[in-house]
Amino acid sequence: MEIPIAEELAKKQKSISVAEFFEKNRQILGFDSAPRSLITTVKEAVDNSLDACEEAGILPDILVQVERTGQDYVTVIIEDNGPGIVREQIPKVFAKLLYGSRFHALKQSRGQQGIGISAAVLYAQMTAGRHTKILSKTGSNVPAHYYELMINTSTNEPDILMDEVRDWFRPHGTQIELEMKAAYVKGRRQSIYEYLKATAIVNPHARITLIDPDGNEEVFERATDKIPDPAEEILPHPEGIELGTLMKMLHYTERQKLAPFLRYSFCKIGLLTADEICKAAGLDPEIDPHALGRHEARKLIEAFQKVKIMSPPTDCLSPIGEELIYRGLEKETNVDFIATSTRKPAVYSGNPFVVEVGLAYGGNLPKEEKISIMRFANRVPLLYQQGGCVTTHAVEDIRWKQYGLNQPGGGVPIGPVLLLIHVASINVPFTSESKDAIADIPVIKEEVDLAVKEVARKLKHYLSKQSNLKKRREKEIIITKVLPKMAVKVANILEKDVPDINPVVAKIMGNLLVYRKVKSNGDGTADVAIKVKNFGTSAHSFRVHEMLPCKINGAKPEPKVVTMDNDYDYVWDVSAAAGSSKVLSYKIESATVEELRKLPQLIVEGIEEELVTGAKAFRGV
């Protein structure tokens, strides 16, 4: 008798493990080319290191080393000073897909699914046929544990090839070494160097060292010793819950009554709100949640929309902050102007999120190319699929011409600008498992739009100010060319000394005039007066620096003193209203006439040089 075709087909059907699935679909996780595979591996390891260090309250110190081991193969070593991993967990952490501690935690974190580093181990054994080496230590008084691991793709379980105790110089930390088919590239935005540079900008508390295949070492120093505030885990918010998820929660809850179930299973639901929800759903607050079916669960979902429930708490987020974004950009770029913005937290589908933006302008950034957009999600750089990301779409939709940048044909504008956009959330809505781009969620796009426009307005103000300063500079150049010639001619006619033209220039320009008057007393002492006159129409606050090789006496007002080897920097904090004058005086006890004649130029800190006459000036930070 002929066997039915259905039975023949049934014999061929079998389940596959998640490891087998990703073994045949590695491109889903970002292992689709030789250069990208290396970047993805480094990214996953560095993410783990940063998360572990921050959770343990340790300032991260991370080493990334890449060595060529063949024409198409590299060995990559990532080492950190984190808390280490206990011996029993090492094989599962590195050689079991979908194994981790953050999947169910509702708080901001870099890694979540428990796939990343295990996928790198899987890729290494697939392409190079080699095991992965792990060394980890949890404290200075315990030995380090060394493992050599591979993944059994049929069972998604670790194969332990070696397990032994070793000595290690680090008091605590973890090291992973993988050999794989990959390529180390330079000079691209999508490279290990650019990835680590971007990581250093948004993680200014981390120190990251890169040793490339040629032995060159690049250190991205930390800009702060402050570890980010830890993100707190929160309960799910009713706004974003789905029917199936709610039914599962009702089925598995330990609560015996509906009202307590609502209070202790969701955030921002108190006693009164729970009663309101039950009333809106037409359900008894005392009913056993296990007895509720699909129909009742749907009523609860509808009640969540009817009852006013507070937004979820935002302590589950850990934004970078405007000051540290500024420091990160300042540390890793050479630019003329930096502006930052951190928006207030917002919510999409019950998930709190916050958008932060930094803008750097000028310096050595290319002037005739499209602006650079650096995208980040939960402090992790997004290097690929820029065109498919909501952050890029928000930038493209802004009319940049009104902010001083050209935008021929629309889209990304042209100019010497680096735009940093960071989205932090407990659940970043990526477009794919490879986490390359953020989905087009309207409220996220709106927040990005508002944050970018805020820094764009600051840029517009800066460019307008620079334009005005340029005009002043051109005007002053003309004046300083004409006036001296006039002064010489008038002095010759009147048979008098050529006068100092600085007061006249300052008055014409509306500048701040700063100059020194020295009166020698004939006994080796001298009285010095630093005179300040504000000819402008607005007030100025600034610092006056007097750099001298000797000590002074009788200073009025008393300056701050900074000692530098054999020299002294006397610093006065000065505020000068429009049209006002100030005098800073002091006495020098012993100085020759020649020394008095060679006193260094006064320095004014806090004002653009175009607004000051008679002294050297700089704006400062």
Curated annotation (Swiss-Prot):
GO terms for biological process: DNA topological change. Its EC number is 5.6.2.2. It comes from the Archaea. Disulfide bonds: none annotated. Relaxes both positive and negative superturns and exhibits a strong decatenase activity. NCBIfam families: PRK04184.1, top6b. InterPro entries: HATPase_C_sf, Ribosomal_Su5_D2-typ_SF, Ribosomal_uS13-like_H2TH, Ribsml_uS5_D2-typ_fold_subgr, Top6b_C, TopoVI_B, TopoVI_B_transducer. Keywords: ATP-binding, DNA-binding, Isomerase, Nucleotide-binding, Topoisomerase. It holds the Pfam family Topo-VIb_trans. The gene is top6B. SUPFAM superfamilies: ATPase domain of HSP90 chaperone/DNA topoisomerase II/histidine kinase, Ribosomal protein S5 domain 2-like, S13-like H2TH domain. This is Type 2 DNA topoisomerase 6 subunit B. It catalyses: ATP-dependent breakage, passage and rejoining of double-stranded DNA. One of its GO terms (cellular component) is small ribosomal subunit. The keyword Thylakoid does not apply. GO terms for molecular function: ATP binding; DNA binding; DNA topoisomerase type II (double strand cut, ATP-hydrolyzing) activity. CDD domains: HATPase_TopVIB-like (cd16933), TopoIIB_Trans (cd00823). Belongs to the TOP6B family. ATP binds at N48, D80, S101, R102, G111, Q112, Q113, G114, I115, G116, I117, S118, K435. It comes from Methanosarcina acetivorans (strain ATCC 35395 / DSM 2834 / JCM 12185 / C2A). Homodimer. Heterotetramer of two Top6A and two Top6B chains.
